[in-house]
Amino acid sequence: MRSKFRMLTIMATTLVMIFVFAGCGNSAKSVKGETFDGGNIEVFVPEGWKAFHGADVFGDYEEGYDPNTVSIGKGAESELDLFNKPMVHITYSGKDRTLSMPSKELYKDGKDIEDIKTSDHTWRGYTATSVGYPIAVLFTEDGDEQIQVAVTLENGDEKISLEDADVLAILEGIKVKK
């Protein structure tokens, strides 16, 4: 009787441990969301975030928006919310222009960060303060093409970090349409 009780206790403890550890971690792969077609790039948009096409400021594009730029706001309902919510702003160089990594000296308190590796890219970058807001700037190259990501880490009452599963899922989900 005692050994049966001990065996049941061990099995129950093992099952509890499996469920506890299965729920741990900040895996980008476990984030739910959908793909947004930005034109020349596709991006992953987690639930609770909303994506917007880049503005065609000079009327250069047939689409009526910049197909190389996407902004994704956490908790955003409209494009105006991008001014008071944490956001990720993605810019792709396109095939006929070149982007370069913005200098951290342009910002206050610029500090290099460790590279962030996703399945398709290795992102290098830094954190800094821009107009009083904590930001991160990331950059990667894919042959002759580049992608720059600017992350507003705090805005309004909300904060995000580069370690958040949502942010990692966004970085993982940036795909250049070939």
Outline where the language-model segments fall.
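Conserved polar/disulfide-associated segments of primarily extracytoplasmic proteins
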Residues: 55-148
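C-terminal motif of bacterial Sec signal peptides marking the signal peptidase cleavage site
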Residues: 19-23
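Core hydrophobic alpha-helical transmembrane segments of single-pass membrane proteins
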Residues: 12-17
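Short glycine-aromatic motifs
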Residues: 28-33, 49-50, 107-113, 121-123, ...
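Surface-exposed amphipathic alpha-helical segments
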Residues: 49, 147-178
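N-terminal "mature-domain start" segment
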Residues: 28-66
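Bacterial N-terminal signal peptides that target proteins for export
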Residues: 1-11
